[in-house]
A protein has these predicted regions:
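P-loop NTPase motor domains
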Residues: 1-183
Length: 183
């Protein structure tokens, strides 16, 4: 198994609600674009809009854990975390809706999308686990030039999603820096 650098979008240092919302929106927007036989539905969006922020607040999370969130046989601890969310709407969602049997096909459809990413070993190594690169710190270091060398041939099906996640993360850091400079 080759060593790869990791930039995990779920591994965020800044856990203020604004950053969590921005990061969750970025992750959701990219997951929507994964080609699958299932059309991306409002119910799928609803599930992800509630699950992703819970994992971002929790910390030490990943796409693998988001995938586990969709498995009702293995997600009891994550549901409990959702019920304790500081966001009242999320808390209510996990209390009242998430375990409803009518959502099982929706969660399976979300899991299929996630599996497409997780099954790509290189993508999984690059995006899951503890981040080994502090991209925000590197971006804020004067005079630093950051180059990503991504071999498309090694990630035929997940290459564009990996690139979009990196661009999304960079945009969040850049917007945060712009906000700091204004203050």
């Amino acid at each position: 198994n080759e060593k790869t650098p990791t930039i995990n979008p779920f591994d965020i240092e800044d856990k203020n609600e604004s950053n969590i919302k921005q990061t969750a929106k970025m992750i959701l927007s990219i997951l929507k674009d994964i080609n699958d036989d299932d059309k991306f539905s409002g119910a799928m969006s609803d599930v992800l809009e509630n699950c992703i922020p819970v994992l971002l607040r929790k910390g030490n999370s990943s796409f693998i854990e988001l995938y586990r969130f969709m498995n009702d046989k293995r997600n009891k601890d994550l549901i409990e975390l959702g019920k304790k969310s500081i966001n009242d709407l999320e808390s209510e969602y996990f209390e009242d809706k998430f375990c409803d049997s009518s959502l099982s096909t929706t969660k399976e459809a979300v899991a299929r999308r996630l599996r497409k990413l997780i099954n790509d070993e290189l993508f999984s190594n690059l995006m899951n686990g503890k981040s080994t690169i502090n991209l925000e710190q590197l971006m804020n270091t004067k005079g630093k030039i950051i180059i990503f060398r991504i071999l498309k041939s090694n990630m035929l099906h997940s290459y564009k999603f990996y690139a979009r996640f990196i661009i999304g993360i960079i945009q969040i850091f850049a917007l945060k820096r712009a906000n700091l400079e204004e203050k």
